[in-house]
Amino acid sequence: MIDVSVLICTRDRGASLSRTLDSVTRAVGVAGDMAVEMVVVDNGSTDDTAARLAVWQEEQAFPVMLLAEPRAGLARARNLGLAHVRGRIVAMTDDDCVLKPDYLLALVRRFAGVATPTIVGGRILPGDAADLPVTLKLEDHPMEPVPGAFPGGFVMGANLAFTRDVIARTGRFDTRFGAGARFVAAEDTDFLFRAIAAGVVVAYDPYFVVEHHHGRCRPDEVIALLAGYGYGDGALYAKHILTDRRILGAIRRDLGDALREIRAGTRPFPYIRRFHSFRLRHMLRGFFAYAGHGLTARVRLSNAHEKA
């Protein structure tokens, strides 16, 4: 029986991926007799990723499965990987992350005795001092989400682990969300949102750790990233607003944050004068884009039925 399946999806990051894979090899070596498999999904790379993966696979003493998903989209790639994992625990990280050597040992300790569908996010530290401080999770103590709160940012897909039975309870990732998809982000938040609604236990644990070498060194790169996050969250709000009251609570919180920011004249984010207003603007874009997409789809379906 496989104890842990490590799932990584990659696209055109050959050099970065090699660093990630080497960290997996080290972590497996430290893990002793733990049964670990590696599942890598190449999401349409056009660089030397395939060649690097083939060489690395031959060098490993543990099972490595290489899959290809040519259709763009991180959620699509993850879904393909999830259809093939065999481990009791699935550990997802990104192709620009590096696992700490004791990652697998700490992960298995956290899930020891867990008997119900459970998701646990791990710590994400900066990998390069030149990178700006985004897409990190720095808290050094275990946490649980606030009941009824919107889970965005509580844990992140760059270091996310769960028992394999979570998939049957929650469903797979929504392929309309995430990198490479129509709504560019929030695929992990949507997954968490549905999981919590389905009764899955969600928690944060700081003891299984990755370093994130995201490479964003300029403010304009960070601003574009945060605009995408807002856009994705807005689309997620539109997806769930009619069926889940947590969305209304999240909207009230976002509006309150923006008003307090305007009144106080504070600048919570160094590169954006009014961050919460900036976020609201891009959330509105995402909200109406999702609503318009849904309306278009319904019209097409109606027209198809009329012609049938």
Please place each PLM-identified region on the residue numbering.
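Glycine-rich, basic loop-to-helix element that forms the pyrophosphate-binding segment
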Residues: E69-V85
